[in-house]
Amino acid sequence: MKGTSEVKPMETHRKLLKPLVEKRRRERINNSLEKLRIFLFQTLKSEKLKNPKVEKAEILECTVQFLQSRKLLPLDREAVDKEYQSGFQHCLETTLHFMNSKPDMNGVTKELLSHQMSSCKSPSDAWSPNCAPLTKHVPSLSYQDSAPHLVSNSISISPTKTLVDSHFTYQSFKTWRPWV
C-alpha cells in the first residue's frame, strides 16, 4: 500500500509538468519558424512571407525551395578560394603576432608552429585544402630558438621565400598531427 501512495505524487508531478514542457516546446518551434520566416523574407523578398501570420507549412515549403535552389547554384570557386585565403592569412598573422609576443615560448612549440607554416605553398602552386597560398607579405618574425639547427633565426613569410633555411628541410619528418 505504501508503494502506491509514493507513486501517486510522482504521477501527479509528471502530469503537471507535461503541459509546461509542451508549451515550451511549441514556443521554441514558433520562435524558430518566425526567425526562419524573417530570414527567408529578407533573402527572397517574397510577398507571401511578409505577413507574420503566414502558415507554418508555407514557411517550411519556402525553406525547402530555397535550399534546393542553393544546391543547384554553381559554386563560385574563385570567391571560395579568396575567402579561404583571407581567413588563412588572418590566422597566420595572428599566429605570428602570438609568437612575437612570447619571447619565452618553448623552442619545440616554435619549431612545430614554424613547421606548420613552412608547409604552405606559394601562390603559383595549386590550391590545397591543407594550406592556402599566401597572397600578401606577413610581418617578419625573429627569435632565437633553442634548436637553431632546425629553424632559421629569422623567419619571414612572403610569396617568394620559404620559412626555413635551405640547409634543413622537414621532408624527413612525418607531418605532425595533433590528434595522433
Curated annotation (Swiss-Prot):
UniProt induction comment: Not induced by Notch-signaling.
Primary localization class, coarse: nucleus
Intracellular or extracellular location(s): Nucleus
Domain bHLH as annotated: residue spans: 13-70
Single GO MF annotation: protein dimerization activity
Record Pfam families: Hairy_orange, HLH
GO BP annotation list: midbrain-hindbrain boundary development; negative regulation of DNA-templated transcription; negative regulation of transcription by RNA polymerase II; regulation of neurogenesis
Free-text tissue specificity from the UniProt record: Expressed in the presumptive midbrain-hindbrain boundary (MHB) as early as the early gastrula stage (stage 10.5). Expression in the MHB continues through to tailbud stage. Also transiently expressed in the eye anlage at late neurula stage.
Residue ranges crossing the lipid bilayer per the database entry: none
InterPro entries tied to this protein: bHLH_dom, HES-7_bHLH-O, HES_HEY, HLH_DNA-bd_sf, Orange_dom
Domain of life: Eukaryota
Residue positions of motif WRPW motif: 176-179
Key words, A-Z: Developmental protein, DNA-binding, Nucleus, Repressor, Transcription, Transcription regulation
Record-annotated Orange domain positions: 84-116
GO annotation, cellular component aspect: nucleus
PROSITE patterns documented for this protein: BHLH, ORANGE
Record's subunit section: Transcription repression requires formation of a complex with a corepressor protein of the Groucho/TLE family.
Purpose: Transcriptional repressor. Represses transcription from both N box- and E box-containing promoters. Demarcates the prospective midbrain-hindbrain boundary (MHB) region in the neuroectoderm in early gastrulae embryos by repressing transcription of a number of target genes.
Record remark on domains: Has a particular type of basic domain which includes a helix-interrupting proline.
Protein name: Transcription factor HES-7.1-A
Organism: Xenopus laevis (African clawed frog)
